[in-house]
Amino acid sequence: MKFLVLGAGKMGYAVAYDLIRGAKVEKVVVADSNTDNLKELVKRLPDEKIIPVELDVTNEEELAQLMAEIDVAVSCITYKHNYELAKIALATKTHFVDLGGNEEIVAKEFMLDELAKEQGVTIIPDLGLAPGLVSLLAVSAAE
């Protein structure tokens, strides 16, 4: 599988770190507008599966071209872009996951559900720290 990680900061690094260990992962394209972040990520994750790309996510045409070659895109950038990213994912038939962070944006993403189903695309918004990890830790503490 081919993945696109949007954002080469701490969260993007963590996602890329986990992805390159997957046996079925062919490549992990990591895109960021900050070349210093990309250089640091490549330095810390020297793996042939990692492909750094300088990209501004607001350049929708360039982003769509990149997404069209990918199976799954993971947004590790600010929530402000997630709704537009989800729409581009639908247009390119790319599965999409984001870390969430804003209920209004997530609600807008949920409104794309029917279209996503029709196109056979999975969109999973708000898969960040809470409710994900926080819920698991709460269950663990309760047990």
Name each model-derived stretch.
Residues E54-V72, H81:
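Conserved Rossmann-fold cofactor-binding substructure of NAD(P)-dependent oxidoreductases
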Residues K27-V29:
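Short beta-strand element of Class I
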Residues Q119, I124-E143:
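Rossmann-like NAD(P)H-binding beta-loop-alpha module
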Residues G12-Y13:
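N-terminal Rossmann-fold NAD(P) dinucleotide-binding loop
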Residues L19:
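Aromatic pocket-lining residues of Rossmann-like dinucleotide-binding sites
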Residues G100-I123:
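Rossmann-fold NAD(P)-binding glycine/threonine-rich loop
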Residues F3-G7:
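Conserved N-terminal Rossmann-fold NAD(P)-binding element of oxidoreductases
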Residues S33-N37:
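Helix N-cap at the beta1-alpha1 junction of Rossmann-like dinucleotide-binding domains, i.e.
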